[in-house]
UniProtKB/Swiss-Prot annotation:
<feature type="domain" description="Lipoyl-binding">
    <location>
        <begin position="24"/>
        <end position="106"/>
    </location>
</feature>
<dbReference type="InterPro" id="IPR002930">
    <property type="entry name" value="GCV_H"/>
</dbReference>
<feature type="modified residue" description="N6-lipoyllysine">
    <location>
        <position position="65"/>
    </location>
</feature>
<dbReference type="InterPro" id="IPR017453">
    <property type="entry name" value="GCV_H_sub"/>
</dbReference>
<protein>
    <recommendedName>
        <fullName>Glycine cleavage system H protein</fullName>
    </recommendedName>
</protein>
<dbReference type="GO" id="GO:0019464">
    <property type="term" value="P:glycine decarboxylation via glycine cleavage system"/>
</dbReference>
<comment type="function">
    <text>The glycine cleavage system catalyzes the degradation of glycine. The H protein shuttles the methylamine group of glycine from the P protein to the T protein.</text>
</comment>
<dbReference type="GO" id="GO:0005829">
    <property type="term" value="C:cytosol"/>
</dbReference>
<dbReference type="InterPro" id="IPR011053">
    <property type="entry name" value="Single_hybrid_motif"/>
</dbReference>
<keyword id="KW-0450">Lipoyl</keyword>
<comment type="subunit">
    <text>The glycine cleavage system is composed of four proteins: P, T, L and H.</text>
</comment>
<dbReference type="InterPro" id="IPR033753">
    <property type="entry name" value="GCV_H/Fam206"/>
</dbReference>
<dbReference type="GO" id="GO:0005960">
    <property type="term" value="C:glycine cleavage complex"/>
</dbReference>
<dbReference type="Pfam" id="PF01597">
    <property type="entry name" value="GCV_H"/>
</dbReference>
<comment type="similarity">
    <text>Belongs to the GcvH family.</text>
</comment>
<dbReference type="InterPro" id="IPR000089">
    <property type="entry name" value="Biotin_lipoyl"/>
</dbReference>
<dbReference type="InterPro" id="IPR003016">
    <property type="entry name" value="2-oxoA_DH_lipoyl-BS"/>
</dbReference>
Amino acid sequence: MSNVPAELKYSKEHEWLRKESDGTYTVGITEHAQELLGDMVFVDLPEVGATVSAGDDCAVAESVKAASDIYAPVSGEIVAVNDALSDSPELVNSEPYAGGWIFKIKASDESELESLLDATAYEALLEDE
């Protein structure tokens, strides 16, 4: 079973979301997602300043197996991207919940968080796959 940190929120598309002290949210892909994709070779990051809607594809993770869209779990403005992934995309594999984060978003409608999964619900989703 994959590591599913209890303090995070999750999407059904295998993104995770962590609220930061400044009110923004850090987004990445889950350990389960990176295990399915395999070794990362490139991450196409979104543009800082871009406005996205929940469910929009806004980044791409390319691995030795496949290219997979990464979706915005909430609507808002992209306020930062993880530039370290340009040189070290493997951080998504080795540290999916830490150094392998993908972007930070300032949510425009925090009520959208209610549609995300908590750790227990995400674990149940994984068991059903």
